[in-house]
């Protein structure tokens, strides 16, 4: 059997990629939405209105237990989007690898294999970029829009109107914007729904909008002379100590299906979230995995 079929296997590609990523931290999306896998492509999730705890009713001894209504829930079903893409191993590389195998020169063999494995891990990097983009789209808008290779699909997680707000003043205008007041108002709204925001997700450009606003300087340094500025450390300290928010900066870009560079998290948008997991990135089974489970792999 040709060397390529012995060496270029899914297990070896995974091992090669894992070694490359050994010292790379998890992305914000991977931390907030850890991965898990299920059988099939049907995703069911429960949407409820849990929020404020309702105190238990008092009762006398030796009386019937009063029954509480369960919270209103909706069971939603979605068909998972399916993505696949391949990359050819060039005929020249295959031929060269087979020739080198006869020489027993492992150093030269490893050089060619490294080129092939790097091509394969490009696909993995592309898949991870797609996942991160979808996670950040959910965080920033509550929706996922897919328009790729003839496939059009929208997934709406049903954010209520009261869960989003738009400032009356553009944060990019430092003369009139008051982002800290807007954030405080949003925190009050979230708290009234029975939740406590513990972190704020935004990109560096939006962070600069907040930092550079004149109203921010006045709030953090009320006695500072005209023209004073607020440092990044001072703003982070204020958000942490005064508003109880941990800063989660999400920067970076990816190339979308139209070949355009796009930011993972949009400018001028912030999202208030609790600490810890926000949900899961659920993977269904691919046709190839399904065949392997059924013993029909070819």
For the regions a language model picked out, list residue spans one by one.
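Assembly/oligomerization interface modules of large self-assembling protein complexes
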Residues: 33-102
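Charged, low-complexity intrinsically disordered segments
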Residues: 51-53, 66, 141, 155-156, ...
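Short secondary-structure junctions and interdomain/linker hinges
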Residues: 20-27, 130, 134-137, 190-197, ...
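N-terminal alpha-helical "arm" segments
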Residues: 1-44
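Short acidic (Asp/Glu) and glycine-rich catalytic loops that position anionic groups and cofactors
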Residues: 162-164, 215-216
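Sequence/fold signature of self-assembling virion shell proteins
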Residues: 217-298
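Long, contiguous amphipathic alpha-helices that act as assembly "spine/axial" helices in icosahedral shell
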Residues: 84-160, 178, 182, 188-205
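Ordered core of a single globular domain
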Residues: 181-229, 233-238
């Amino acid at each position: 059997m040709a060397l390529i079929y012995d060496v270029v296997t899914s297990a070896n590609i995974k091992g090669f990629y894992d070694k490359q990523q050994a010292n790379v931290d998890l992305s914000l999306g991977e931390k907030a939405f850890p991965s898990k896998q299920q059988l099939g492509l049907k995703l069911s999730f429960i949407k409820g209105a849990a929020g404020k705890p309702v105190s238990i009713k008092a009762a006398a001894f030796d009386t019937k237990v009063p029954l509480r209504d369960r919270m209103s829930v909706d069971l939603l079903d979605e068909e998972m989007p399916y993505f696949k893409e391949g990359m050819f191993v060039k005929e020249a590389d295959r031929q060269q690898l087979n020739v080198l195998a006869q020489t027993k020169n492992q150093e030269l063999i490893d050089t060619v294999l490294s080129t092939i494995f790097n091509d394969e891990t490009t696909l993995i990097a592309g898949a991870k970029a797609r996942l991160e983009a979808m996670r950040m789209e959910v965080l920033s808008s509550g929706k996922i829009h897919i328009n790729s290779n003839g496939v059009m699909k929208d997934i709406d997680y049903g954010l209520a109107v009261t869960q989003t707000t738009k400032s009356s003043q553009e944060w990019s205008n430092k003369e009139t914007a008051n982002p800290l007041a807007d954030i405080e108002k949003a925190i009050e709204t979230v708290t009234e729904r029975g939740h406590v925001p513990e972190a704020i997700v935004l990109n560096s450009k939006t962070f600069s909008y907040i930092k550079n606003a004149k109203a921010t300087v006045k709030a953090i340094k009320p006695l500072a002379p005209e023209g004073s500025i607020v440092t990044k450390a001072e703003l982070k300290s204020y958000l942490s100590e005064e508003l109880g928010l941990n800063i989660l900066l999400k920067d970076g870009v990816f190339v979308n299906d139209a070949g355009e560079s796009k930011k993972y998290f949009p400018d001028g948008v912030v999202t208030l979230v609790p600490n810890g997991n926000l949900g899961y990135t659920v993977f269904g089974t691919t046709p190839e995995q399904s065949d392997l489970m059924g013993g029909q792999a070819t």
